[in-house]
Each structure stands twice: as structure tokens, then as C-alpha cells.
Amino acid sequence: MLIFDSGVGGLSILKNIKKILPNIHYIYMLDNESFPYGNKTEFFIIQRSIKIIHTIKKIYPINIVVIACNTISTVALSILREKFDIPIFGIFPHIKAAEKITKNKIIGLIATKATINSSYTQKIIYEYSCSNTIKIIGTNKLAVIAEKKIRGVAVSQKKLKNIFRPWINLPTCPDTIILGCTHFSLLEKEIKNILYKTRSVYFIDSIKKVIFQIKSCLKTSNVNQKIKKNIFLYSKNNNNLKKLLSFLKQYKFTVIKHINLN
């Protein structure tokens, strides 16, 4: 199984996969050279995704791909499925689930600008805005804050307040928030403290849904596990990567190495 993202957000998916499928082996591709995907063009996102899968597929016998990134999923998933002959799973903003949960009919969606602007997201926003008020924040800054948190940098309350100011100033805030980026679940506590100090809020991500799909695929198809160890690949060696290494110990990678994607 290959799981890839431009940052560590995808590790939240990997963590949940490990809970449900503890015996599975995996490759995690950290495309930190391209971080963040959220400020890249659709052309770049599509070409980069093809390059990652093609390059790793030539070296390792991967049989499932998990795109641990809302931006790539909303922009490129259909193209990737056409191009490769293995199951490919993506993660998407789960507005349908939010509609079932919201009490005040005000739903918040926070995602990267590329995810918000994608035709997929625009379509579902239009579909569900008929019966709900959907408040949107498109930002590439929150993923950067989450990455820094993983490396031990304190989360700036001032920066968070600036990002969420459009919602802070609302007479009634969303009671249900869709986390449209795998990084954002790392900041749930901080987001709640900024917006809802005395009230409850329900956060929605799509991790459970994609894990259910993966589990079903493994049960119902002839997908056999061919990778025999856990591998961590990265596209750029820098100081941020070095600070991340201690955090990676919990995932029990037996191989950590650079891979050239250029």
C-alpha cells in the first residue's frame, strides 16, 4: 500500500489504517519538495501525482494507493484511476455527513484554496447550499501551522484568529465544521478554543470513510500484500525533515530514504 501527501497530514490516515489493519505493510511518500499542494496549479498537481505513483510503482510492488490529500483527490483522482490499473482511494470534504449532523443548518468548510476552487468541491457546495448555509474558508496557511506543530513549534493563536476571523465575526458560528485537509485534524483543539470556548462543535473529516473503503477492497478483491516492510520516502532532505524523524518512530518504519521525483 502506498500512501502519499506533501506533508504529515496523511500520517493521520496511516494511524487509523494501522488500528484497523495492524498487519498491513505500507509505503508513506512525503513529497515535502512540493509542500503544500494547496498553492499549486491543477496541472502541477495532476502531473506530480502521476509521477509519484509511476516512480514508486516501478520500484516497489504496490497494489493499493491512498491519496492522503483532499487537494489531489478533488483535482486528480479520476485521472489517476484512468491511468493506473490498481485501486486508488482519495479523501474528500464530507458535506453529506455534515448535513445529517448540523442543528443550526450552518456548516463550516475549511480547506486549501485548490480544494475549494476544484470543480468537485464547487459542485457539492452548490448541491448542499440549497438547504444549508455553508461558510467557507480557503487557506493554505493552516497546513503550514500543522506541520510546524508536529515539529514542536507552538501554535500561534494570533495566526489562527486571523485565519478564522470571518467566522469569529459571525453572529452565529457553524455548529459543524468539515476539515477539508488531512492536516487540519492536528489542530482540532486549537480551532475549538478560538471559535467555541463555551459551546460544542462537531468536526468532520473523511478518514473513517476512506478506511472503510480500503478495508472492503482488501476483503472483496484479490489484492495481495506484496510489500514486506514499512518504508518512508521523502522527496527533499532539509532541516524540517530532520526534526520530523523522532515523530516518525511511532510508525515503525524500517526504511527511511530519499527518492528522486525530478
Swiss-Prot record:
Pfam families: Asp_Glu_race. It comes from the Bacteria. InterPro entries: Asp/Glu/hydantoin_racemase, Asp/Glu_race, Asp/Glu_racemase_AS_2, Glu_race. GO terms for molecular function: glutamate racemase activity. Substrate binds at D5, S6, Y37, G38, N70, T71, T182, H183. PROSITE patterns: ASP_GLU_RACEMASE_2 (PS00924). It catalyses: L-glutamate = D-glutamate. The active site is at C69 (proton donor/acceptor), C181 (proton donor/acceptor). One of its GO terms (biological process) is cell wall organization. SUPFAM superfamilies: Aspartate/glutamate racemase. Its EC number is 5.1.1.3. Keywords: Cell shape, Cell wall biogenesis/degradation, Isomerase, Peptidoglycan synthesis. Gene3D superfamilies: 3.40.50.1860. Pathway: Cell wall biogenesis; peptidoglycan biosynthesis. Provides the (R)-glutamate required for cell wall biosynthesis. Belongs to the aspartate/glutamate racemases family. This is Glutamate racemase. It comes from Buchnera aphidicola subsp. Acyrthosiphon pisum (strain Tuc7). The gene is murI.
